[in-house]
Amino acid sequence: MKNIKEEIERLRKEIEYHNYRYYVLADPIISDEEYDRLLKKLIELEKKYPKFSSPNSPTQKVGGGVISGFEKVEHTTPMLSLDNTYNETEIKEFDNRIKRLLNRNSVEYVCELKIDGISVSIRYENGEFRQAISRGNGIIGDDITENVKKIKSIPLRLFKKYTIEVRGEIFMPIKEFEKYNKIAEEEGLQPFANPRNAAAGTIRQLDSSIVAKRNLDSFIYYIVNPENYSLKTQWEALDFLKKLGFKVNRQSILCKNVECIIDFWKKMTKERKNLDYWIDGLVIKVNNFEFQKILGETSKSPRWAIAFKFPAIKKKTKIIDVELNVGRSGIITPVAIFEPIDLDGTIVKRASLHNFEYIQDKDIRIGDYVYIEKAGGIIPQVVSVVKEKRTGLEKEIKIPKSCPVCNGPVGKLTEDEIAIRCLNPHCPQKLKRHLEIFVSKSAFDISGIGEKIIDKIVDAKLIKDIADIFYLTPFDLAQISGLGQKSIAKILEQIEKSKKTPLNRVIVGLGIPMVGEKTSKILAEKFKNIEKLSSATYDELIKIENIGPEIAKSIVTYFQNEKTKEIINKLKKAGVNLEEKDVKKSDKLKGLTFAITGKLKSYTREEIKKIIEENGGKVSNSVSSKTNFLIAGEEPGSKLEKAKRLNIKIISEEDFLKLISG
């Protein structure tokens, strides 16, 4: 029994280390497959020996439970807000005031990026995660412990057994924000207005399994009572936090004077659009903790820190029209067309209005002057209406009575749904958008069929559903303007080749609502073929890790549809692969790590990656000293130069194939 306990503890430490490498350092040293194997082994042991379970095990970051509400908790020390400024003059006044109060000619400052997320305070006892509290009103916050445990960059055990309270910011990366909103709009859910709202809405979920799926992230920047750890400056504290295993923002800098602060602010004003998280300014802190104590604080904010905010990326323009777009699931999305404006160096003339409820809430009309802002510094969005500029000639934007494409009926699938959909199952626009996913690299990967060809094929009524693509003939394609004999032959060759597509990518191509690449892979591995998947019950699906009630319901509904059954039968008759192949594996590449750069001739990157992993090797997204080979295709990127500097062996695609066959 002692050996079992030791093995569980060993696995926890190993997984925690790999979590730190992946989520904090962004430098993994094992493949996803190896990581999943370790985690699965730990889950099995904890289930088999529940007396050795721990609330701070890495297994607590997956799955989740439902609570009835959040308990109110008082902070050990208040979480104060910051005074802020938007201009250089006031930041110089702040510097002069600090120097005057301290009676010094110069003061050192730490400049940190001001992450626009949700502030959190986290307490550890003997290195073990104990409690997380939201900022709330600064005095009392909500106990959000279970939800914060699901954030992969927040350690459940520290590298050293300190009892410590730290503070930081929880945020949703822009890529995750865009991904969520895309799915939300496709499924008729309310999208989030910006990444901050997305983080706030997620962290307040009563079901922590939802938090686990939304991939929130964090930066930790503050230690309560730093003198307890012999720390004298904020700069030392940031380094100390890194050593404990926290994710600390690497963009922070140390400034000796106010000119350095202003230069950094100007630099980040321009560069913030390149970040994968939303920042709205800098936080300027006096570096020396002794000086911070002397300066003290008011009832609302510390005197030793200030937020130096960026100017808003917001401009006024006039809406000249509203376009109605139909997605693959039939959802009708209104898009505002407005007079072009330059928004942070980009000419913008359109922005999604999400849904008709959003339009009604903001009372947006054609002819209105509105403010356009970049949500997260990236996505143009209508944020408010300038109602005082109305003339009375503005036109209300009404919910359409029929589909703007096919004139079919429109409505909601359920009473609670926000989205308005085209209810015509044969709407050509729905088919066009679905086909774009079907032929994409993440699905059947049929090159030569782009958006324009899809539009022409559907408009010519050559296909009525996605399965019809496998029944196209040279005669059919000859009717499409712009396609010569060579192009037709190439397209048909690609269609034939795509019949061997792995099951997980076939599932992506089916376009099941709420089922993306990751879920498709889980389903393929679990059910092995389309017949078993199509007959899976809700109860079977809900037991699978990472498949929640909504996804399970969506899968069952999809396969119960008569049209789906017809499509599956047509795919079978066409000879499309509908089962997971058992791949023979070898250890030829065991212990070897590969990176890939440039365009490959015979295989896609995913195919090469699969071959490497099937033969015991690993694939890294970056080149490091641990990389053994770089496979270089045509037009290689920066990885090639780095590989040369590190003396990594560079091989061609042909060399790699010889290595495998040898």
Curated annotation (Swiss-Prot):
<feature type="binding site">
    <location>
        <position position="285"/>
    </location>
    <ligand>
        <name>NAD(+)</name>
    </ligand>
</feature>
<dbReference type="GO" id="GO:0046872">
    <property type="term" value="F:metal ion binding"/>
</dbReference>
<protein>
    <recommendedName>
        <fullName>DNA ligase</fullName>
        <ecNumber>6.5.1.2</ecNumber>
    </recommendedName>
</protein>
<dbReference type="Pfam" id="PF12826">
    <property type="entry name" value="HHH_2"/>
</dbReference>
<keyword id="KW-0479">Metal-binding</keyword>
<dbReference type="Pfam" id="PF01653">
    <property type="entry name" value="DNA_ligase_aden"/>
</dbReference>
<dbReference type="GO" id="GO:0005829">
    <property type="term" value="C:cytosol"/>
</dbReference>
<dbReference type="InterPro" id="IPR033136">
    <property type="entry name" value="DNA_ligase_CS"/>
</dbReference>
<feature type="binding site">
    <location>
        <position position="309"/>
    </location>
    <ligand>
        <name>NAD(+)</name>
    </ligand>
</feature>
<comment type="function">
    <text>DNA ligase that catalyzes the formation of phosphodiester linkages between 5'-phosphoryl and 3'-hydroxyl groups in double-stranded DNA using NAD as a coenzyme and as the energy source for the reaction. It is essential for DNA replication and repair of damaged DNA.</text>
</comment>
<keyword id="KW-0436">Ligase</keyword>
<dbReference type="InterPro" id="IPR001679">
    <property type="entry name" value="DNA_ligase"/>
</dbReference>
<keyword id="KW-0464">Manganese</keyword>
<feature type="binding site">
    <location>
        <position position="422"/>
    </location>
    <ligand>
        <name>Zn(2+)</name>
    </ligand>
</feature>
<feature type="binding site">
    <location>
        <position position="406"/>
    </location>
    <ligand>
        <name>Zn(2+)</name>
    </ligand>
</feature>
<dbReference type="Pfam" id="PF00533">
    <property type="entry name" value="BRCT"/>
</dbReference>
<dbReference type="InterPro" id="IPR003583">
    <property type="entry name" value="Hlx-hairpin-Hlx_DNA-bd_motif"/>
</dbReference>
<dbReference type="InterPro" id="IPR004150">
    <property type="entry name" value="NAD_DNA_ligase_OB"/>
</dbReference>
<keyword id="KW-0227">DNA damage</keyword>
<keyword id="KW-0234">DNA repair</keyword>
<dbReference type="InterPro" id="IPR018239">
    <property type="entry name" value="DNA_ligase_AS"/>
</dbReference>
<feature type="active site" description="N6-AMP-lysine intermediate">
    <location>
        <position position="114"/>
    </location>
</feature>
<dbReference type="GO" id="GO:0006260">
    <property type="term" value="P:DNA replication"/>
</dbReference>
<dbReference type="GO" id="GO:0003677">
    <property type="term" value="F:DNA binding"/>
</dbReference>
<keyword id="KW-0520">NAD</keyword>
<dbReference type="Pfam" id="PF14520">
    <property type="entry name" value="HHH_5"/>
</dbReference>
<dbReference type="InterPro" id="IPR001357">
    <property type="entry name" value="BRCT_dom"/>
</dbReference>
<dbReference type="InterPro" id="IPR004149">
    <property type="entry name" value="Znf_DNAligase_C4"/>
</dbReference>
<feature type="binding site">
    <location>
        <begin position="81"/>
        <end position="82"/>
    </location>
    <ligand>
        <name>NAD(+)</name>
    </ligand>
</feature>
<dbReference type="InterPro" id="IPR013840">
    <property type="entry name" value="DNAligase_N"/>
</dbReference>
<feature type="binding site">
    <location>
        <position position="427"/>
    </location>
    <ligand>
        <name>Zn(2+)</name>
    </ligand>
</feature>
<dbReference type="InterPro" id="IPR041663">
    <property type="entry name" value="DisA/LigA_HHH"/>
</dbReference>
<dbReference type="GO" id="GO:0006281">
    <property type="term" value="P:DNA repair"/>
</dbReference>
<keyword id="KW-0460">Magnesium</keyword>
<keyword id="KW-0862">Zinc</keyword>
<feature type="binding site">
    <location>
        <position position="403"/>
    </location>
    <ligand>
        <name>Zn(2+)</name>
    </ligand>
</feature>
<dbReference type="InterPro" id="IPR012340">
    <property type="entry name" value="NA-bd_OB-fold"/>
</dbReference>
<dbReference type="GO" id="GO:0003911">
    <property type="term" value="F:DNA ligase (NAD+) activity"/>
</dbReference>
<feature type="binding site">
    <location>
        <begin position="32"/>
        <end position="36"/>
    </location>
    <ligand>
        <name>NAD(+)</name>
    </ligand>
</feature>
<feature type="domain" description="BRCT">
    <location>
        <begin position="584"/>
        <end position="662"/>
    </location>
</feature>
<feature type="binding site">
    <location>
        <position position="135"/>
    </location>
    <ligand>
        <name>NAD(+)</name>
    </ligand>
</feature>
<keyword id="KW-0235">DNA replication</keyword>
